[in-house]
Amino acid sequence: TLGAKIYNVGTSPNGLNINKNCGSTFPKKIKSLVKKHKVDLGISLDGDADRIILCDEKGKIIDGDQIIAMLANRWKRKKILKGGVIGTLMSNYGLQNYFREQKTKFLRANVGDRYVKESMQKNRFNLGGEQSGHIILGKFATTGDGLLVALEVLFSMRKGKKASDLLNVFKPMPQILENILVRDKNIINELRCKKAIRKANKLMGRNGRLLVRKSGTEPKIRIMGESHNKNLIIKCIKIIKQSIKY
């Protein structure tokens, strides 16, 4: 229907290679292929296709936050958007600022698509998602669906808009995410870690924000720092890392 020429990659499963060097968690693969084939858009899904990351024609990776911003604009124009948009604690602060400017209500849920869904239902919103690419289009489904999101983007591109123009909606605040492998995720509840987190937050002050949390899927502690001062983010994350890696 859309008349696109498609290059398929990572579509030969053998039961062991799910998400191996491909998909939404390995975006540099799609980036290299977009440049190689000089295509208009790269679409990268995870193994069960509930998560999506895109790559524009210039080779720039487009995360879930930018996709959500684009979808909110599209649905708002079409008078489809209900209530506002649900993001998470990981959503870039630039997205929040953008929605404030657009007078679009934006609320944050805990990290995880189940919490996004719960908040959407509670607030009667029909759009929500995560920076990682879990995006729920409440008009069509009650769970993340990367294929539906891809179709929404492709339909928007039918009018001749380039992906780079369509999907770079807002200027994100510099953000650094570090994942630390640990034996016990409860380490962040220990006194030395709590002290380090307090120290880092004091150093960050009003110049940005820090988020330290246990991974819900891996034996890792995730530390996210966000600020216009990149060196400050690095310093704050280092303080917390040193208390975890000993």
Describe each model-derived feature in a short phrase:
Residues 160-246:
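Catalytic-core signal marking the mid-to-C-terminal active-site face
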Residues 1-160, 166, 172, 178:
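Phosphate-binding chemistry for phosphorylated carbohydrates and sugar-nucleotides
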